[in-house]
Amino acid sequence: MKGDESAVADFTGRFARNPKSGISDEPESARVVMSKRRLVVAGEERITVPLSDVVDVIVGNVPPDVRDLFDATITIGHRTDDGTVETLLIEGGEETISKFQAVLFKCLLNGTKARVKHPARVGGRVTDEPVRNAKLSITPERVGITTADGKFAIDITDVIAFERIDRGIGGGEGPTLLVRHATGGQATVSLVSPLSNRRLNLLGRFLRVEYGKLLREVADIDLGEPEKQLLVAVYATGGDIDFTGVLDGDAARATNVLNSLREKGLIEEGASGVSLTPQGQVVVNQRIEDVNI
């Protein structure tokens, strides 16, 4: 295969077509091959799905009656020739599905044309930034946006919340994705309106998958006020700070709080000092949102 038909994913797994509650047949073994243009699942039959027909991607959500039959999964919704939507559930090892998910979203979303307004709002202030034409690029860590004036990115770890709004920007028709994210300690709003509704839905699903993963990792972490203060201090200073000064000069207390944050996986130490982990960044973002409300 050449060009867009070169394989970007190739693995052996299992699959089920249109799995539904009440159906408990064993999934079928298959080879899964994907290029930048199409997905092929080759088992007893060969299923070919053009990526331009993919309308939804769901990671890990399996109907209850077949849940015990699968491990790590990804479900792909796609339109058929008669206009109906079918689903294809693919199973593989956890690492394999994680890599496949990342490549799939890149193939589906890279090069997406969109109108963007960035930033549309900083804190409570509406900006006068113009709406620009842009192209999107995707990695598991961020959404990259390229305009005629330059490039910027929205890191997943900076996301506070996002929602679909049913109006367009820059004279275009809706809908639009409104993304609230942290920038320099302030809650910022950016508006992204892909020219294709299908791409907008997939972009929303991508954010839901990646941001949801981080939210689940911090959902059960309980923090006291001293821990929150130190996390914000690390964020604000990049870790270059006398931590005892944050907690009324109590060195022993500061050490205990730092150790607690480290054990909870919210900070890490490297050659350049203390820094936030992705999970720590999410916790700080939520606090920034609370302050800006």
Segments from the language model and where they lie:
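Anionic N-terminal interaction surfaces
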Residues: 1-32, 44, 68, 77-135
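Non-transmembrane, membrane-adjacent beta-strand/coil modules in membrane-associated proteins
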Residues: 23-27, 56-86, 161-189
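Phosphoinositide-dependent membrane-docking surfaces
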Residues: 39, 48-63, 143, 151-168
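Long, low-complexity, charged/polar intrinsically disordered regions in eukaryotic proteins
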Residues: 156-219
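Short amphipathic alpha-helical interface segments
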Residues: 215-247
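Short amphipathic alpha-helical interaction segments
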Residues: 248-263, 269-271
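Minor-groove-contacting beta-hairpin "wing" of winged helix-turn-helix DNA-binding domains
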Residues: 272-278
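Short, amphipathic alpha-helical interaction segments positioned at domain boundaries
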Residues: 281-293
